[in-house]
Amino acid sequence: GVVAWTGENAETFVGLYLSQFPVGTIPAKLTFKAAADSNSVWMIVSGTFGERRLNLRRPETLPYIVANKDWVPVEYNGNTTAGSPLDFSVYLDAPAGKYGPVIINRDGHFSFRDAPGKRIRFFGPNLVGTANYLDKALADDFVTKATRLGYNTVRFHHFDNGLIDPNASDSLTFDPKALDQFDYLFAELKKHGIYSCLDLYASRELKPGDNIKELEGRSSPEKFILKRLIPISESAMDNWKEFARRLLTHRNPYTGLTYAEDPALYALNLVNENPLVITWQGWDPALIPLFEERYVEYLKEKGLDTPENRASRGGLFIEFLNDLQIRSIEEQKRFLKDELKLTALVTDLNMTSKFTLNSAREHLDFVDNHQYWDHPMFPVAAWQM
């Protein structure tokens, strides 16, 4: 057999073998015994019968390092000693934004407006939910640890709900305390050479005072419903614009700049994980007729209105969804760059690798796409420092 899984328990290194045994006809009973000279603890996790032989290729033996005179276990707690070999803050070029806004240079790399030959690659974490809103002491501690890890970017993610005044009738009124915490953290990151990016919509929960036409009379709309509504609803688009306006034209008292003009904000994602080819059906079927009505209008404009095409959810329908998405992206970009004078790069459609999204992604400054490995799980306090 081959080692199919490895891990550790409190005492030692453990593994599971994937083995196969020819048995001929289906037996009434099978007995397995450990080798006589084995001092291991053996168990059978599962078994199955099959007619096909497995191709069990034996991979190269992976090294397993144990504590000894040459290897000492290190428990990481973030408190890297300043100036030590593990302090990577020396590689940061502070403050963030010193070379002007980040641009895409002629070779397709991240660079700077005032130093186009100087490349930068971004490496850093997401801050999610309440992790975006820290008191000043904790913010200082986080920034110190982040710089010593060599991080040069932080993504403010799912920050939108925490920024909203819980007592307001809409989801557009900011909470002054939360805004101050956001401003301070951004400014400290900037001061130490860490660039920021954010999503203008991730999970902001709508309220009755938002006056979204398509949601009138509905008490509890789907949590992420704005993702689907923005491309087809004028009032939803206006709501997105107003949130963006209030955030990006706000002058951070710790930097003296608005977010729209601050080069330390190097990128904005319009709407988090929103490709209509994935989201148009959503969890709430109530919006599906809105897309179907728009699809019929699209077919009529193209001279393709037939019963077969109306029923299709294949290529024509995907082209229709991409057309909606492109129109939405272009309007959002126009608003940000022409009206708000945004200097940051703009991206969107940051989920899935479907080739059908290529035509829409051509309308972005750069492509941001998400892949997940070992996604965090929390036994106690989710997404908190």
Feature map (PLM): residue ranges:
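Mature N-terminal, pre-catalytic/accessory segment of carbohydrate-active enzymes
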Residues: 1-126, 132-137, 141-145, 149-152
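Active-site mouth of glycoside hydrolases
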Residues: 42, 99-109, 113-377
